[in-house]
Amino acid sequence: MDGSEKTSQDWGHFHRPLFADPKSRDLSRVGVIDVGSNSVRLVVFDGAARSPAYFFNEKVMCALGAGLADTGNLSPEGRIRALAALRRFCTIAKDIGLPDLTAVATAAVREAKDGSDFVGQVLAETGLKIHVIDGSEEARLSAQGVLLGWPGAYGLVCDIGGASMELAEISNGQVGKRMTSQLGPLRLASIKGGKQGRKKVISESLEGLRAQLGQQSDRLFLVGGSWRAIARIDMQRRDYPLHVMHEYRMTPRDIRETSEYIKANNQDHLRKLAGVSSARMDLVPIAIDVLKGILRHFKPHDIAVSSYGIREGLLYEHMPQAMRDRDPLIESCRFAERKDARLPGFGMRLHKFIAPLFPKITVDRERLIHAACLLHDVSWRAHSDFRGEVCFEYATRANLGG
């Protein structure tokens, strides 16, 4: 049952709610570990919902890829931190009662001479099997993560890690061409020749990528911690009032102005204002040089930040196609109504009641009205004097994908 069949209940073109589908209920908590070049993270999704609910989400900055360009090996200190983090994550997963953990490692472990030794050590000490994925697979999973949040997305996905940067084309819900490069800021920090040497490497690498992919005039989707740090600083520079990272939009001009803003300010002061860790802030000046190069070579018309990446792409792998095709906004609002409203199901009746007031609206506008109807009663517990404010906070700051 995928929710598309006819029943006595008319669900409209958004179909039966996913939480009413037995197959969806069978997808219990999903645990994913991402062993990156800069950080190690555990995410536990509370079921493979169309709009993911994060039951647990923790990151440890390990810098496994620090010095990789010079030594060819993983950072010894990074290995110690990563092993400690993985032991802890495995203990947490056991305490939560996860049936299984999916663990992937990316560029640093993939390219290091001692990468396979590290994978073996993790298996011996924790029982966790790490799957080392290649650059093409890394790009595919990141692109799938973007599709989890934007089912109809089109454009170029750019995922930056510590030791690599991946590009993937997306269109009509499908992942197209995929490319990988060595443009991770942790790796670039070790390039000889200082800033000029880095600029030369960045320019030459991007020229090669553009030759393979061609100009990308659609949207550029940014995935990765360094991109999110740049977006946080851009928010701070613009005094942007809504500090929600997912779907935050920027223009090429914004990036240029934020680059100058970073150069003109003390980095320690800036990172505190923007809420960026010191380890991440050290990489931001390099990452923004890469981003400016991407804009020059590919010329996208606008930029959107995606909080969804590899980990969400792995969640996407668990989903049947019928679930992938659903609208994440409507599904998350339906779930919120079922969990928090006094009369679950009334939102759909309310939507039908007011529909004649909007005879000529677009599909995009209709889905927003539908979502508002579903959320109309989820804040009933708030004090009546502040209920309007609480409703606003819920709608603007809740974890509503799409």
Task: Name the predicted role of every residue range.
Residues 33-39, 158-164, 223-226, 307:
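A short acidic Gly-Thr/Ser loop motif
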Residues 36, 105-106:
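A secondary-structure boundary/capping signal
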Residues 1-29:
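Non-catalytic pre-domain segments flanking phosphatase-related domains
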Residues 121:
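Acidic donor-binding segment of Leloir-type glycosyltransferases
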Residues 51-62:
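N-terminal glycine-rich anion-binding loops that anchor highly charged ligand groups
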Residues 99-103:
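Conserved beta-strand/loop subsegment of P-loop NTPase cores
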Residues 26-53:
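N-terminal basic/disordered segments at the start of proteins
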Residues 30, 44-47, 63, 67-96, ...:
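Helical "lid/coupling" subdomains associated with nucleotide-phosphate turnover
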